[in-house]
Amino acid sequence: MVTEQDPTTLMKQQVGKAAAEEVKSGMIVGLGTGSTTAYMIQFLGELLQRGELKDIKGIPTSFQSTVLAKKYGVPLTTLDEVDYMDIAIDGADEVDPQKNLIKGGGAAHTREKIVDCLAEKFVVVVDSSKLVDKLGSTFLLPVEVIPMAMNPVIRAIEKLGGQPEVRMGVKKAGPIVTDQGNLVIDVKFDSIDNPGELEKSLNNIPGVLENGLFVGVADVILVGEIDNGKPIVRTIS
């Protein structure tokens, strides 16, 4: 049970609910990955059950969002079956003042970037702890890599000034494996002064599938905050 002593969860629930209310009947919805987005999927299911939403279909960005959508009764489709997506709702690990993002804490950033970039509107849901002045301040930058290219990619990233390390599993022996069967390298940069340039440079390394920089993609940021002991949602557009 959630209590008032758990402000982070309260913020995530509130912003997840606000994001679900952005969805209208008949929409195709990109379903993001992460703890805040999980509440959004739950609230979408509740709106469908109450009849307040009808005829929506979700496109999941990960195995996690697929499982949650099925659990809460959100119908699913695929990019093969639709040629238009009304809205994508997803979380982020960092958000800078220009609405650029670092994503990939859940190792799903490749699928997330595909879905989020295809949507007509991309809404980001975060709690206030994810707001930073400069990307890379608190979170390492994830890079998805084809396994055979891991060592060459590490060397190339070091030449770009990064400090890379392979992400290892928790309660699992060995590295994290993505839904695509690849590895994730988490990279520390002393300063990410030009996120757009770095995003392109990393993706130009042979063996890199995608990195967690999302530059110029987000349309709206919904931020969960605590004001006078109560959770509120602030909109950055």
Swiss-Prot record:
Q: What is annotated as the active site? A: E112 (proton acceptor)
Listed under catalytic activity are: aldehydo-D-ribose 5-phosphate = D-ribulose 5-phosphate
Q: Please state which protein family the record places this protein in.
A: Belongs to the ribose 5-phosphate isomerase family.
Tell me which EC number(s) this protein carries.
5.3.1.6
Locate the transmembrane regions by residue number.
none
Q: The organism's lineage? A: Bacteria, Bacillati, Cyanobacteriota, Cyanophyceae, Oscillatoriophycideae
Which PANTHER family is this protein grouped with?
A: RIBOSE-5-PHOSPHATE ISOMERASE (PTHR11934:SF0)
What name does the UniProt record give this protein?
Answer: Ribose-5-phosphate isomerase A
Q: Does the keyword Isomerase apply?
A: yes
Q: Describe its partners and assembly state.
A: Homodimer.
Q: What pathway does this protein act in?
A: Carbohydrate degradation; pentose phosphate pathway; D-ribose 5-phosphate from D-ribulose 5-phosphate (non-oxidative stage): step 1/1
According to its UniProt entry, the protein's GO biological process terms are:
D-ribose metabolic process; pentose-phosphate shunt, non-oxidative branch
Q: Where does substrate bind?
A: T33, G34, S35, T36, D90, G91, A92, D93, K103, G104, G105, G106, K130
| Task of the protein | Catalyzes the reversible conversion of ribose-5-phosphate to ribulose 5-phosphate.
